[in-house]
Regions:
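Membrane-interface helix-boundary motifs at transmembrane edges
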Residues: 1, 42-47, 85-96, 168-178, ...
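Short periplasmic/luminal acceptor-recognition loop of GT-C membrane glycosyltransferases, typified by
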Residues: 323-336
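Periplasmic/ER-lumenal interhelical loops and adjacent helix-loop junctions
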Residues: 93-208, 249-255, 312, 316, ...
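Structural signature of transmembrane alpha-helix termini at the membrane-water interface
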Residues: 15-19, 41-44, 61, 79-87, ...
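Membrane-embedded helix bundles of polyisoprenyl
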Residues: 2-84, 100-120, 125, 186-187, ...
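Transmembrane alpha-helical segments
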Residues: 32-44, 72-80, 162-165, 212-227, ...
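Contiguous transmembrane helix-bundle modules in multi-pass membrane proteins
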Residues: 66, 175-188, 195-317
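Aromatic- and carboxylate-enriched substrate-binding clefts and catalytic-loop regions
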Residues: 24, 28-29, 67-77, 127-139, ...
Length: 336
């Protein structure tokens, strides 16, 4: 039941469905990333260690843009698995095992340099002519719900994710606490997003590879609720405070505020009803409704340009840009 529920949640995450028809390049690497996570499990069990390099290499060759964040997600999951199998970890053992694991990822990067190096050269050579500007105020840490919830250019889950992160941060399990802290830092520190984007801009779409890690915390919390190991009242209060902080900190729209309120009401209602009657299907229905709300909002929030308004053939701006690029000897890039 837990595996089915998580599969449903993963399928209905906002970026997965949206980009499957909008920007396939934002999610086409996901199969290799998931296979990489499975290979990491085998790696720390002493099985087929070469598979980590293989799946990381294929992920990099599939999507160069998500190379940094994809490798970062694999590294975080590697530390998570290492902490899980080592009950008494030491710094010396961590350095030894971490170096051996990092070598597998570095080898994948070296193999993929045939694609990464030309792309990196293009990014660096065209940077001076770019028009991207990052305000220092955007680096101020805060509760940015856009990095986690509803948005199709981010992890794009529901408030249960916030509940899961909070639960993980206060968990007694070292590996789970580590993952919760990592997800919390990613969601509150824009400079991390800026670095994962190659210092180009602060755009949360680079966090999409962390979706499976969010699902992992999702599963831990779901399983704890089923076993009755969570104190829901304090978690509900903290989740509400975090949601309110996100609303007031980033001045969200009325529509987003409505979805946050609806999400919170549905989530808390299903949790407390489940605690009374102990029927697992109630919890599943509540989470499914939250995900459906999130996915529907994310997909309908995108405004497409009507075909009748496009002016590719007669656009003076397009012709001017094409003439300028053609007159330059160095490689150029444009913002999309």
């Amino acid at each position: 039941n837990t595996a089915f529920a998580l599969s449903f949640v993963f399928l209905f995450s906002a970026p997965l469905i949206f980009h499957s028809h909008r920007h396939i390049m934002f999610v086409n690497y996901m199969p290799f990333l998931l296979l990489g996570f499975m290979a990491i499990e085998d790696y720390f069990e002493g099985k087929r260690k070469y598979m980590v390099t293989l799946w990381a290499f294929l992920m990099l060759m599939t999507s160069y843009f998500f190379a940094v964040s994809g490798l970062a997600a694999m590294a975080v999951y590697g530390v998570y698995r290492w902490l899980k199998i080592n009950e008494k970890p030491t710094f010396k053992k961590f350095c030894k095992d971490g170096t051996a694991f990092a070598f597998r990822l570095i080898l994948a990067v070296i193999m993929a340099c045939v694609l990464i190096l030309p792309t990196l050269h293009c990014m660096l050579s065209g940077r001076e002519a770019g028009n991207s500007h990052v305000d220092l105020k955007s680096f101020i840490p805060g509760v940015n719900l856009k990095f986690l919830l509803y948005y199709h250019y981010s992890i794009g889950l529901c408030l249960f994710t916030v509940l899961s992160i909070i639960s993980a941060v206060f968990s007694k399990q070292r590996y789970r606490r580590f993952l919760g802290i990592v997800m919390m830092v990613i969601a509150t520190c824009p400079i991390i997003v800026y670095m994962l984007n190659g210092t180009l801009y602060v755009d949360p779409k680079v966090l999409i590879p962390f979706l499976p890690l969010g699902m992992l915390l999702f599963g831990h919390t779901y399983f704890d609720i089923i076993r009755g190991k969570l104190k829901l009242k304090p978690l509900a209060v903290i989740t509400l405070l975090v949601a309110l902080a996100g609303v007031f900190w980033f001045k969200t729209t009325k529509k987003v505020e409505f979805y946050i309120i609806l999400d919170f009401v549905v989530l808390m209602s299903s949790l407390f009803v489940y605690r009374r009657c102990k029927k697992e299907f109630i919890l599943n229905i509540g989470m499914s409704l939250c995900l459906v709300v999130s996915t529907v909002y994310a997909n309908f929030a995108d405004e497409l340009v009507p075909l009748s308004e496009l002016e590719y053939d007669n656009s003076s701006d397009m012709n001017t840009l094409a003439d300028y690029v053609g007159s330059q000897e160095e490689i150029s890039r444009t913002s999309n």
